[in-house]
Amino acid sequence: MLTNGRLWVSVGVTSEQGPRADNQDFAAAYLGSETQRARQGLVAALADGVSGAKGGRMAAELAVSSLIDGYYAQGDTIGPAAAVERVMRAYNRWLAAMGRSEAMAHACSTFTAIVVRGRRAHVLHVGDSRAWLLRDGHLTQITADHTRSHPDQRHILLRALGLEEQLRLDHHEIALAEHDRLLLTSDGVHGPLSARRLGRLLGRRQSAEADAAALVEAALAAGGQDNATALVLDIVSLPSASHDAIAGDMARLPILPPPQVGDSVDGF
């Protein structure tokens, strides 16, 4: 398969209920068509519905599906981070309002997303799910948990989807290299497993699908008491640097207001 000059990835996702009564995690990736990948990139996201709240699974699944649907509806002239923030702020307002209803009382969810566009990855994050980068055998945690610092209160989220009407997403931008591995985990995976263990398992470099399954299996075998979800993205090939520069220039173009009656446009 020829992939030179194109964005190409391999993806693997595994999610297990574990000992919980139901699975409130949800993760998915949308690779799109070759044209979509060239213009807007690809999207992957993981969300973990807050346990004990009604509608936790629904909040998580709708967060991911809303991102995927809404991101590609934004068009390719807006930057990836701005597009994700626009979509998720609208979703957060809806979820916060629904959280006041009986059907979805206090529904909240963590949310961690990766947009790979050109030769760069954009990570948007709120909550305590995590994004990681494996490069040259070294695993780096990209995101920071939005939880209380006291060891006995680290399960308490300070920021999440639906928790407040105003959403604040952390944004990290990373220059990618071919053969990088990006990883998303719920706390049911990185809770029982140390970063060193995660790095060893991910560094075996089997298929993305096999390694996602191995991470979840190891977390549950280590005594994990939560839902466990892992999403692995292997960067197989990247477009040329010139493509990245053009995409960046387009994203920085100002969005002008629509013309009004009587305005002159290009001399007409």
Pin down the residues of each PLM region:
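PP2C/PPM-type serine/threonine phosphatase catalytic domain
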Residues: M1-F268
